[in-house]
Amino acid sequence: MSYQGGTFDVIVIGAGHAGVEAGLAAARMGANTLMLTLNLDAVAFMPCNPSVGGPAKGIVVREIDALGGEMGRNIDKTHIQMRMLNTGKGPAVRALRAQADKFRYQQEMKRTIEEQENLLLRQGMVDRLIIEDGECRGVITNTGAQYRAKAVVVTTGTYLRGKIILGELSYESGPNNMQPSIKLSDHLKELGFDLVRFKTGTPPRVHGNTIDYKKTEIQPGDDKPRAFSYETTKFITDQLPCWLTYTSENTHQIISANLGRSPMYSGMIEGTGPRYCPSIEDKIVRFSDKPRHQIFLEPEGRDTSEVYVQGLSTSLPEDVQLSMLKTIPGLEEVRMMRPGYAIEYDAIVPTQLWPTLETKKISGLFTAGQINGTSGYEEAAGQGIMAGINAAQKAFGKEGVILDRSEAYIGVLIDDLVTKGTNEPYRLLTSRAEFRLILRHDNADLRLTEKGYELGLISEERYSRFKAKQEAIEQEKQRISALVVKPSDEVNQLLERLGSRSMTEALKATAVLKRPEMTYDHFLKIIPRPDVELDDEVYEQVEIQVKYEGYIEKQWQQIERLKKMEQKRIPEDLDYDAIQGIATEARQKLKQVRPLSVGQASRVSGVNPADISILLVYLEQGRLAKTSS
């Protein structure tokens, strides 16, 4: 028996990392929002690694925060350890990574959602969507509740027709033995969506009290207080270490001897797994020349003894898992608390989406997270906030918001998905971004806070602080550009200590700062200090902008050229069959993706420069024909 459950502006299906960002963004923009989840005890659940951030991913978390999202704030309040990675490399690849207290992370996020105005969190399983005249107008749950809305965001993670595989055992399930969503997957097929089958996996968890840590290497957090969120002022100083160990020759022998029992090699697993997070059995086969592989032992929280065995993702039978664990130094007497497993799930082919993450087939229907073929909490959250923003914009009758590839890693991620698609769970890497020196960890606020403020996601107080920081950066750059450093014993002694060549003549202060060895702390010892003491973030920005000025300027020139191509718009209903001379493969791909600009068309796989030249001529002819008529 069905009944009317209520009417909303936006409905979000799922409360994982994509869902919570989507729901919070829509509600904060003023949309009356309903968030439905299979289990209220699994809001923002971390079914795999208990961590947030890392290369590229950490920058996404900063971008989410700069837009007004929650992931950064939440991990700042609930982490057990934080480290800045790649500190010995340039600023383009530096990234923050935090070990999460996964249980506190969930609790804190759930509390935030429950206290958010305009947002109702409810437990419920969505079986069908309400479609009227090609538009999504709500959802129907398995209890018969009908909820109406102007826009719906689907963020179902790995629950769509989820199947856990552990050795010879397999059964329908979401992650961690939670209830899967079967009917919604079937319904999406009925609606004509192309689905693919992907797979991911997780390692065993072991009892921390049974680890011999003396045989491992300690991995402490950074002494310097760090944070993902630009709003964080209180820092956690009581950190817990992680530990490093390695597989052994015996580990590899046990795995090799049991490959016949591995679902990956027996044919039980049909889904495509993530290239950049292979299972341990896959590593042993693909990298047979390596005598050992790194294993990180990561605590899952402050109030549990469970330890996550990072690097040992597996779907081998339980008895094999226990045997191979005991061959790893430090784990000889270990007790396994949960076995690792593989999980298969349905995802949609993401080229069926516009860059707003709205589906091309059904207006008002958005998808975000692992349903779009990505892997990782951060990639999911980045899509989630954009889908939530655009669902709210749709509900309000406003234009969608698209981040381009020069604005954010989130823009790179979404553009890759909707333009190129993916044949495997997509992981964001710094190498996927053309403009890495622009898309840095340290400047996410300078890139995106203005946009977050315009959307109503950034408070007046935070925006005022941001504008003050912007102004301080410009003033300090102007101040030092007028200074000259003269050679002296004091100056040359400092340069000698830093391993930098001594000065024989006066130099512009900016030329001295550009030296690789010169940090701003040292720089302030040889120039007058500013009248007002500035924040470390201001000094950091000035140093990076001055040091890498030439490289940054080159990237901006590239961006300007790209923008010219992005500004050449393509009508959504363009008839590609009417364009003579385009290669058959290019025509098929362009009809499938339906790019919105010539820039996007140039990134579609199978489309070459000759095809783009023909497309440009055709569009120009059409424009001239319209003008003359």
UniProtKB/Swiss-Prot annotation:
It comes from the Bacteria. InterPro entries: FAD/NAD-bd_sf (IPR036188), GIDA_C_N (IPR049312), MnmG (IPR004416), MnmG-rel (IPR002218), MnmG-rel_CS (IPR020595), MnmG_C (IPR026904), MnmG_C_subdom (IPR047001), MnmG_C_subdom_sf (IPR044920). GO terms for cellular component: cytosol. The keyword Transmembrane does not apply. Its main location: cytoplasm. It is found in: Cytoplasm. Pfam families: GIDA, GIDA_C_1st, SAM_GIDA_C. Keywords: Cytoplasm, FAD, Flavoprotein, NAD, tRNA processing. One of its GO terms (biological process) is tRNA wobble uridine modification. NAD(+) binds at residues 273-287. FAD binds at residues 14-19, 126, 181, 370. SUPFAM superfamilies: FAD/NAD(P)-binding domain. Its cofactor is FAD. The keyword Cell membrane does not apply. One of its GO terms (molecular function) is flavin adenine dinucleotide binding. PANTHER family: GLUCOSE INHIBITED DIVISION PROTEIN A, PROTEIN MTO1 HOMOLOG, MITOCHONDRIAL. NAD-binding protein involved in the addition of a carboxymethylaminomethyl (cmnm) group at the wobble position (U34) of certain tRNAs, forming tRNA-cmnm(5)s(2)U34. Belongs to the MnmG family. Homodimer. Heterotetramer of two MnmE and two MnmG subunits. This is tRNA uridine 5-carboxymethylaminomethyl modification enzyme MnmG. It comes from Shouchella clausii (strain KSM-K16). The gene is mnmG.
